[in-house]
């Protein structure tokens, strides 16, 4: 059975950052890392998933998982890819292409992977080892839980026990959008903070002990007439210690991009 929860020890030599959804935007990610003076020899980057689709460099973003300083949970966009690799007939390819896959897959995944077998091999490896959840230890003993869309339970240890055996719980970690509910707040016991992406927010938000960090890579190149609140979509990377300083956020209506 694959290890669905990856536990990562504290970084004793450098800094740790978390980053929101990347969606194939490699160059904006590199610009953000340069802005925070990221040092790949010492620092580490933890991703909430959705590395691929929509942007022009999905391959380069997917291959970041080969770097020793890069850690990522799977997002719903990776899971669509993994589902196709496992059972092509079980995936609506036209929907996938409309959902942002066309930017790198062209007319479809079958032809693309025939031309790029090395990317297919990397994706097949990730399908077997990419976790649903990362548990990150800090030097002071605090712990941060990272998953793509949310943490759907009230107790951290419940997830540890149930995740391998409950497909519905696995789906919830990839697809649920509770932050879109007015007034949503959840405090997860047994973990100090949780960090998520999936739903675009105009700025990093805290609900209970959950941090939502997807500030809009999905919006790059899109007209923003749907909302005047997100006038500056970006990829956001935050040092983990700073997450604890983010105040609780009143519950606005996040944007309908994921």
Predicted regions and their residues:
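N-terminal active-site segment of His-dependent metallophosphoesterases
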Residues: 1-62
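Conserved beta-sheet core of the metallophosphoesterase superfamily
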Residues: 172-248
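Active-site environment of divalent metal-dependent phosphoester hydrolases
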Residues: 23-27, 53-56, 79-82, 152-154, ...
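Active-site neighborhood of divalent metal-dependent phosphoester bond hydrolases
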Residues: 58-135, 140-142, 170-176
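Active-site-proximal beta-strand elements of phosphoester/diester hydrolases
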Residues: 15-23, 143-150, 212-213
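His/acidic metal-ligating clusters that form di-metal
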Residues: 116-203
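Residue-level marker for buried hydrophobic side chains located in beta-strands
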Residues: 18, 45-47, 72-73, 145, ...
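Divalent metal-coordination and catalytic microenvironments
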Residues: 21, 50, 65, 75-76, ...
């Amino acid at each position: 059975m694959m290890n669905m929860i990856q536990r990562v020890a504290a970084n004793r030599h450098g800094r740790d950052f978390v980053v929101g959804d990347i969606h194939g935007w490699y160059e904006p990610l590199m610009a953000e890392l340069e802005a925070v003076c990221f040092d790949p020899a010492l620092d580490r980057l933890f991703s909430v998933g959705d590395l691929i689709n929509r942007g022009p460099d999905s391959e380069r973003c997917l291959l970041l998982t080969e770097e020793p300083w890069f850690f990522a949970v799977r997002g719903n966009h990776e899971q669509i890819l993994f589902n196709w690799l496992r059972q092509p007939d079980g995936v609506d390819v036209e929907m996938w292409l409309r959902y942002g896959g066309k930017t790198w897959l062209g007319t479809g995944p079958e032809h693309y992977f025939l031309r790029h077998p090395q990317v297919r091999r990397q994706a097949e490896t990730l399908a077997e080892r990419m976790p649903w959840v990362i548990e990150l230890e800090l030097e002071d003993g605090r712990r941060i839980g990272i998953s793509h869309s949310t943490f759907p339970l009230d107790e951290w240890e419940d997830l540890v026990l149930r995740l391998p055996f409950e497909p519905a719980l696995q789906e919830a970690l990839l697809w649920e959008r509770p932050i879109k509910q007015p007034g949503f707040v959840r405090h997860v016991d047994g973990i100090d903070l949780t960090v998520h992406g999936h739903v675009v927010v105009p700025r990093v938000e805290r609900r209970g002990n959950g941090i939502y960090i997807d500030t809009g890579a999905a919006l790059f190149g899109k007209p923003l007439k749907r909302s005047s609140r997100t006038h500056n979509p970006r990829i956001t990377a935050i040092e983990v210690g700073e997450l604890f300083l983010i105040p609780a956020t009143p519950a606005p209506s996040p944007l309908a991009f994921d």
